[in-house]
A protein has these predicted regions:
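Low-complexity, intrinsically disordered or signal/transmembrane-proximal segments
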Residues: 6-10, 16-18
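Histidine-centered divalent-metal-coordination microenvironment in nucleic-acid enzymes
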Residues: 259-266, 303-320
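Helical scaffold of the NTase/Pol beta-like nucleotidyltransferase catalytic core
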Residues: 235-237, 269-294
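Active-site microenvironments that recognize anionic phosphate/pyrophosphate groups
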Residues: 32-271, 345-348
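Conserved His + Asp/Glu catalytic blocks
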Residues: 273, 293-294, 300-306, 317-353
C-alpha cells in the first residue's frame, strides 16, 4: 500500500525545480537589496544627525567619530559605512523620525508611541551633547568675559539645538495679542504640552515624596534617561547658581511660553513658600541677570498652576503687558523714601516700583 501511495505522488519536473530555484534566488536578491537600501538610508540619517551636531556647534570635528559610534550603539548597530554624498540643510525633526522609524522596524524601539519615541530620540541627541562641566565652564566664561546676556544667549541656543526645547513643537503653539482697557495683552495656547490639572497639583502636594527623581525640577533630572511617567532628560544641562546663599539651578522650560522662558529652582527638594525670603531670592537673581525678569506662581494649588512640591521661580527675557500697563496712583512706603511705588491699572491688585 505504501508503495502504491508513493507511486501516485507526482515528482516535480526538472524544469519546475529550476523555475522554483530561480524564484527563490530572485526573492533572496530582493531581500538583500532592500536590506542594503534600508541600511544605506539609515547610514545617511546618522551622517545627517552628526552633521547637525557639527553645524550647530554641539560637537567639533574631533568628536565626529565618537558621536557616530555613540549613535550606532543607541540604534543597535555594530558597523557603519559613511555615505559619500554630503547632506545639505538638516531638518532635525525629519532626521529623528527616520531614525525612530528604523529603530521601531528593527525592534530596538519596542513601542511606537510619542512617549517612547521621545525617550528614544533624547538618547540620540545626548550622543551630541557636551558634558555638564563643559557647559557650565563655557557659560561662566562667557558671563565673566562678555556679559550675562551673552551667557544666556549661548545657553538658550544650546537648549534649543540639543532638542531639549523642541523648536518644531513650539512652532505649533498659538500666540496673538489683543487690545484691552488694561493695555495690549499676550494670549498663548501651548500645544506642545497640556496644562496641569489643579486637582492633580493639589494631590501632588499632599503625596509622600518618593522615587527618583522626586520631581521634574530636581537636580537629578540632568542626564536622566526617563521612563513612561517621567520625561527623558539625557540632553538636559543645568547651570548652577547661588541664590540667597544657597545652591540653586538655572534652566529653561522645555515648553517655552515666551522668549527665553527660564526656571530657577532650589537645589533641594523643598516646597514652594511665598515669604520675605522669596523676595530676597528674586532680587538675587535679577542682580545676576539684569536683562531678565523673575516672578513666582502663587503657592496655592487652585491658582498656582505649578509644581508646588519644589521651590522655584519662572522668568525670562520678555516684557509682559503688566510691566507696560498704565499707572493709576503713585505712593511711597514709610522707611523706604527712595522707592516710588505705583498702583497699576490691572484686573487684579498690582503694584509696580
Amino acid at each position: 500500500m505504501l508503495l502504491r501511495v508513493y507511486q501516485k505522488v507526482q515528482m516535480p519536473s526538472r524544469e519546475q525545480l529550476h523555475g522554483e530555484i530561480i524564484l527563490l534566488w530572485l526573492f533572496m536578491v530582493i531581500v538583500i537589496r532592500n536590506n542594503k537600501e534600508s541600511t544605506g538610508m539609515i547610514y545617511e540619517a546618522i551622517k545627517k544627525l552628526v552633521k547637525y551636531g557639527l553645524d550647530t556647534g554641539l560637537i567639533t570635528e574631533y568628536d565626529k567619530i565618537y558621536a557616530t559610534n555613540q549613535i550606532l550603539e543607541v540604534m543597535g548597530l555594530d558597523e557603519y559605512e559613511e555615505p559619500a554624498e554630503e547632506p545639505g540643510d538638516i531638518d532635525l525633526e525629519a532626521v529623528l523620525k527616520e531614525l525612530l522609524d528604523y529603530a521601531h522596524e528593527t525592534g530596538v524601539l519596542a513601542e511606537d508611541s510619542i512617549v517612547y519615541r521621545d525617550l528614544f530620540d533624547t538618547k540620540l541627541m545626548n550622543c551630541l551633547m557636551p558634558r555638564p562641566s563643559e557647559v557650565v565652564a563655557k557659560f561662566w566664561d562667557i558671563y565673566n568675559h562678555k556679559s550675562p546676556k551673552d551667557a544666556t544667549e549661548y545657553y538658550y541656543k544650546l537648549s534649543q539645538d540639543s532638542d531639549y526645547i523642541r523648536r518644531y513643537r513650539i512652532a505649533r503653539d498659538m500666540k496673538w495679542t489683543t487690545d484691552t482697557k488694561y493695555g495690549t495683552l499676550d494670549i498663548t495656547v501651548n500645544l506642545s504640552k497640556p496644562e496641569k490639572d489643579p486637582k492633580a497639583i493639589a494631590a501632588a502636594k499632599l503625596m509622600k515624596q518618593s522615587g527618583y527623581p522626586k520631581c521634574q525640577l530636581c537636580m537629578e533630572n540632568e542626564g536622566y534617561a526617563g521612563r513612561a511617567n517621567h520625561p527623558a532628560r539625557n540632553n538636559h544641562r543645568i547651570i548652577p547658581i547661588t541664590v540667597n546663599g544657597s545652591p540653586w539651578g538655572f534652566q529653561y522650560s522645555p515648553y517655552v511660553y515666551y522668549n527665553e522662558h527660564c526656571i530657577v529652582f532650589n537645589g533641594k527638594h523643598t516646597p514652594m513658600k511665598i515669604d520675605r525670603a522669596a523676595f530676597v531670592k528674586l532680587f538675587d537673581f535679577v542682580k545676576m541677570f539684569p536683562h531678565y525678569f523673575l516672578g513666582s506662581n502663587a503657592d496655592l494649588p487652585i491658582v498656582g498652576g505649578s509644581i508646588l512640591t519644589h521651590d522655584h521661580f519662572q522668568g525670562g527675557n520678555y516684557t509682559f503687558a503688566m510691566a507696560k500697563a498704565p499707572i493709576e496712583k503713585y505712593f511711597t512706603v514709610p522707611d523706604f523714601g527712595d522707592v516710588e511705588a505705583r498702583i497699576v491699572k490691572w484686573p487684579i491688585a498690582a503694584i509696580r516700583s
